């Protein structure tokens, strides 16, 4: 008997040519006697054997487990064949258990797309360029036939699996088989819309509003509120190339700075606040209304109100050009920015630029900023630019702006004011800071006070961190309804607007524009507002 050894896995026996077989120690067994092209009537020589093509014999690939998954295999003609017996390859030190691959019901698979599968166990490393194989996936909608290479499959995270993972071989060892991440095909309900408004009634117990004895330094730290995350239309919002921060389109702009990461049109919710008797208590102190309503001492109330009024106008006159701008009041600080040529103001002498002498008359200075003379308008724009710079520089440190002697007086006055008003401002700041901490929400202030005194109020009451100067509007000349329209033009119709105030004017303006209105008339209203914000009802 002559025996010719062809390869470690192929043996040719001269006595049994009619029973010639190819034995393959791999995951599948191939038998030539069962294939076409081999007959018993004509014995083949060895030379003929190797010159004859066999369409079903595939070249051996190292360590491939093509049929070792224990799954039913389908041929290209979608005909079911008997599964082959799984033999572990010699180089593989472990066996792969048989399991089914379950598809998620919420995913739609189509030929040519990789399925979103969750493989609990890992696979042996396949050579680069492995041809796709056909596999079967069991799902509620039947079977899916698709030639998907493992290189195109993306796996779910463990949180999306409804069956335990196979331990021992993490998928991170085979990055070429799995995508880097998987984005779920659904969106959480919390990101689509806020929680529905609660129908429960707020029952608030009146707590004692006693201010403990504190030093001036500790009180100063208390009123310096923390800065929330930088949000769109908050920190650093200045002039934009095409649309000013007040919402008006600009035909020309001499100055532009880097815009915020997200534009005004990406704001989702805008809270429009009134100032007096909503956020702060000021006018009712001067009239004695607050003292009579809450049983406080009227003399003390009027005294504190007058002292605060003096500090407000002193700051406005000394540092914010109120003497120059009182008769040229603007609705927004950027209303005349288009007349600014961007000149450096570090050495500019405002007291000697002839601003008053060049003005033909105060009655010609309109609210829209229209005034005869290009040179005069440029000087007016310079003043508003300097006001903006001063506000942004000292909005968190007004004590550094007014100086040390006045700073001590201001701290003492603030402490007396909070004690008299039962921490009214503290409650307001809690709600304002909650809104300011949200990434796509913004606080906007609309007040009937002139713009320059309003800015001084905001600084002295410690509100600069929650109200950027671009978000402050004066309704002295046009009314609040007109300001609401400008705000809606600026932030767009898709945003949700909530008006918070105590007066009839803002309530009527909110009703006309279909804006929700939250009335503030007492401490309980502020507490309820803060509670609704904490629960994200607003």
Swiss-Prot record:
Family note: Belongs to the HAD-like hydrolase superfamily. EYA family.
Q: Which organism is it from?
A: Homo sapiens (Human)
Chain's role? Functions both as protein phosphatase and as transcriptional coactivator for SIX1, and probably also for SIX2, SIX4 and SIX5. Tyrosine phosphatase that dephosphorylates 'Tyr-142' of histone H2AX (H2AXY142ph) and promotes efficient DNA repair via the recruitment of DNA repair complexes containing MDC1. 'Tyr-142' phosphorylation of histone H2AX plays a central role in DNA repair and acts as a mark that distinguishes between apoptotic and repair responses to genotoxic stress. Its function as histone phosphatase may contribute to its function in transcription regulation during organogenesis.
Q: What is this protein called?
A: Protein phosphatase EYA2
Q: Which Pfam families match?
A: Hydrolase
User: Which molecular-function annotations from GO does this UniProt entry contain?
Assistant: histone H2AXY142 phosphatase activity; magnesium ion binding; protein tyrosine phosphatase activity
Region of interest (Disordered), residue spans: 209-263
Q: Which GO terms describe its cellular component?
A: cytosol; mitochondrion; nucleoplasm; nucleus
Describe tissue expression. Answer: Highest expression in muscle with lower levels in kidney, placenta, pancreas, brain and heart.
> What superkingdom does the record give?
Eukaryota
* Cofactor info, note text: Binds 1 Mg(2+) ion per subunit.
What does the record give as the active site?
A: 274 (nucleophile), 276 (proton donor)
Swiss-Prot/TrEMBL catalytic activity:
O-phospho-L-tyrosyl-[protein] + H2O = L-tyrosyl-[protein] + phosphate
User: Which cofactors are named for this entry?
Assistant: Mg(2+)
Taxonomic lineage is: Eukaryota, Metazoa, Chordata, Craniata, Vertebrata
Output compositional bias ranges, type Basic and acidic residues. Answer: 234-249
Subunit comment: Interacts with DACH2 and SIX1, and probably with SIX2, SIX4 and SIX5. Interacts with CAPN8. Interacts with GNAZ and GNAI2; this precludes interaction with SIX1.
Where would you find the membrane-spanning parts of this chain? none
């Amino acid at each position: 008997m002559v025996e010719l050894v062809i390869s470690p896995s192929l043996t040719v026996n001269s006595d049994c040519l009619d029973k010639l077989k190819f034995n393959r120690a791999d995951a599948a067994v191939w038998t030539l006697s069962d294939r076409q092209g081999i007959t018993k009537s004509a014995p083949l020589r060895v030379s003929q054997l190797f010159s004859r093509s066999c369409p079903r014999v595939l070249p051996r690939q190292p360590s491939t487990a093509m049929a070792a998954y224990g799954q039913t295999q389908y041929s290209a003609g979608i005909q079911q064949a008997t599964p082959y017996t799984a033999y572990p390859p010699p180089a593989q030190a472990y066996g792969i258990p048989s399991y089914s691959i379950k598809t998620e019901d919420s995913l739609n698979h189509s030929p040519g797309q990789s399925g979103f599968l969750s493989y609990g166990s890992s696979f042996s490393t396949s050579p680069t360029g492995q041809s796709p194989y056909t596999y079967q996936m069991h799902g509620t909608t039947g079977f899916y036939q698709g030639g998907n290479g493992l290189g195109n499959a993306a796996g779910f995270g463990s949180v999306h699996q409804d069956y335990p993972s196979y331990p021992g071989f993490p998928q991170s060892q085979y990055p070429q088989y799995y995508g880097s991440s998987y984005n779920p095909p659904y969106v959480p309900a919390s990101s689509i819309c806020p929680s529905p408004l609660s129908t429960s009634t707020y029952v608030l117990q009146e707590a004692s509003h006693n201010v403990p004895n504190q030093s001036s330094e500790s009180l100063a730290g208390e009123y310096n509120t923390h800065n929330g995350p930088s949000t769109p239309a908050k920190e650093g919002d200045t002039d934009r190339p095409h649309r000013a921060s007040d919402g008006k389109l600009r035909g020309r702009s001499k100055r532009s700075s880097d815009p915020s990461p997200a534009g005004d049109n990406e704001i989702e919710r805008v809270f429009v606040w009134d100032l007096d008797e909503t956020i702060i208590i000021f006018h009712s102190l001067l009239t004695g209304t607050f003292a009579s309503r809450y049983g406080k001492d009227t003399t003390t109330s009027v005294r504190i109100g007058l002292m605060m009024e003096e500090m407000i106008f002193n700051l406005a006159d000394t540092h914010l050009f109120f003497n120059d701008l009182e008769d040229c009041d603007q609705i927004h600080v950027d209303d005349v920015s288009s007349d600014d040529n961007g000149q450096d103001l570090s050495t500019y002498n405002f007291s000697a630029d002839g601003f008053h002498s060049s003005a033909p008359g105060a009655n010609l200075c309109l609210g829209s900023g229209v005034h005869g003379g290009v040179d005069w308008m440029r000087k007016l724009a310079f003043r508003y630019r300097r006001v903006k710079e001063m506000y942004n520089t000292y909005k968190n440190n007004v004590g550094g702006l007014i100086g040390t002697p006045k700073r001590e007086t201001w701290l003492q006055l603030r402490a007396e004011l909070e004690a008299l008003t039962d921490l009214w401002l503290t409650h307001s700041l809690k709600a304002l800071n909650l809104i300011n901490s949200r990434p796509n929400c913004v606080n906007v202030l609309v007040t009937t006070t002139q713009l320059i005194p309003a800015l001084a109020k905001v600084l002295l009451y410690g509100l600069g961190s929650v109200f950027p100067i671009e978000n402050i509007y004066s309704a002295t000349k046009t009314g609040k309804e007109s300001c609401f329209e400008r705000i809606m033009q600026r932030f767009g119709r898709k945003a949700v607007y909530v008006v918070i105030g105590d007066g009839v004017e803002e309530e009527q303006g909110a009703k006309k524009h279909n804006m929700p209105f939250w009335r503030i008339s007492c401490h309980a209203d502020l507490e309820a507002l803060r509670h609704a914000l904490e629960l994200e009802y607003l």
